[in-house]
Amino acid sequence: MINEIRKDADSRMEKSVEAFKNQISKIRTGRASPSILDGIMVEYYGASTPLRQLASVTVEDSRTLKINVFDRSISAAVEKAIMSSDLGLNPSSAGSDIRVPLPALTEERRKDLIKIVRNEAEQGRVAVRNVRRDANDKVKALLKDKEISEDEDRRSQDDVQKLTDAYIKLLDAALADKEKELMEF
């Protein structure tokens, strides 16, 4: 029973770290990358649809993304969705394509992005700690029902704490890498 709780906590903590890494991969650095636009949702016939389903996004050069919209009638909606995102991008239409120039990151914008990344990291840490709390609560319930001894309870809590520390270290390492990447000129 305790092993199942530990395995569940391990997999949930791993998912939290992966979600954090996925989230920060969308935060742009100085280079153009189609993944920057992954989180963009476009209003399409009354439904919020991911941009990836409505258009192909390619890198035109190191500072420009090119979006080829499959249905030209929604080009304006795609532009609006990109402008209203918190990425600070200004797309421009060029026939059937939309070009998204990526402005050079100013020192101020880099610092803003680092704040955003740190906030995401804190949310990741909170998610990992919530998993720890859930696991410890399940173990406490087993102790209360007298299914395990106090020694097993203590040992299990120590194991879950070690897992928590390991996953928070992974989060912090990913945070440090992203901060370093953002500060490169």
Swiss-Prot record:
Keyword Protease found: no
Cellular location(s): Cytoplasm
Molecular function GO terms recorded: ribosomal large subunit binding
Superkingdom, natural source: Bacteria
Gene that specifies this protein: frr
Recorded family membership: Belongs to the RRF family.
UniProt xrefs under Pfam families: RRF
SUPFAM superfamilies, A to Z: Ribosome recycling factor, RRF
Function: Responsible for the release of ribosomes from messenger RNA at the termination of protein biosynthesis. May increase the efficiency of translation by recycling ribosomes from one round of translation to another.
The UniProt record lists the keyword Nucleotide-binding: no
Gene Ontology annotations of biological process type: cytoplasmic translational termination
Main location: cytoplasm
One annotated Gene Ontology cellular component of this protein: cytosol
Keyword annotations from UniProtKB, A to Z: Cytoplasm, Protein biosynthesis
NCBIfam families documented for this protein: frr
Disulfide bonds: none
Protein name in UniProt: Ribosome-recycling factor
Membrane spanning residue stretches: none
